[in-house]
């Protein structure tokens, strides 16, 4: 069975709320086990090599930057071969900044550079998830599991 990991950064709780809702969407249609890790726990990027399917979540800091908590992990990703891994990225965003959800784009590009198969376009939610965003997060989880399992057969 495919192994799933989700690593996220959340300062205000919005991205973690997204993470939990995405996991709900996944577990509604599959009994896969997802290891959920807060970036504050200090995981090393090498852990990604142990998993078949990767979800990363981050809010955008300042004017289009990764959160400081994600920087070491991001740099460590340069040394990881993710060829054959299924991946997608999500995050909470703030439209008051000029670069909306840039952290989602930055992480997506890094995963792609390291060989991961990006199975879904990044999911961006304005601040905290409203009712429509909750549905989108659940669908993101469902779509991720479907695309990850189908494409690994």
Predicted regions located by residue number:
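FMN-binding flavodoxin-like domain, especially the glycine-rich phosphate-binding loop
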Residues: 2-4, 14-17, 25-30, 35-37, ...
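Aromatic-flanked redox-active Cys/Sec active sites in thiol-based oxidoreductases
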Residues: 8-12
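Conserved SAM/SAH-binding loop
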Residues: 39-41
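Short hydrophobic/charged patches on amphipathic alpha-helices used for structural packing
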Residues: 43-45
């Amino acid at each position: 069975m495919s192994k799933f990991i989700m690593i996220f950064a959340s300062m205000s709780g919005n991205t973690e709320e997204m993470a939990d809702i995405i996991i709900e969407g996944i577990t509604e249609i599959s009994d896969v086990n997802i290891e959920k890790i807060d970036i504050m726990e200090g995981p090393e990027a090498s852990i990604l090599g142990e998993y078949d399917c990767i979800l990363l979540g981050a809010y955008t800091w300042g004017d289009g930057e990764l959160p400081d908590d994600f920087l070491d992990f991001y740099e460590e990703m340069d040394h990881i071969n993710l060829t054959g891994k299924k991946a997608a990225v999500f995050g909470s965003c703030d439209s008051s900044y000029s670069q909306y959800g840039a952290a989602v784009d930055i992480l997506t590009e890094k995963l792609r550079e390291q060989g991961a198969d990006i199975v879904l376009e990044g999911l961006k939610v304005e601040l905290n998830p409203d009712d429509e965003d909750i549905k989108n997060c659940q669908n993101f989880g469902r779509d991720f599991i479907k695309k990850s399992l189908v494409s690994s057969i």
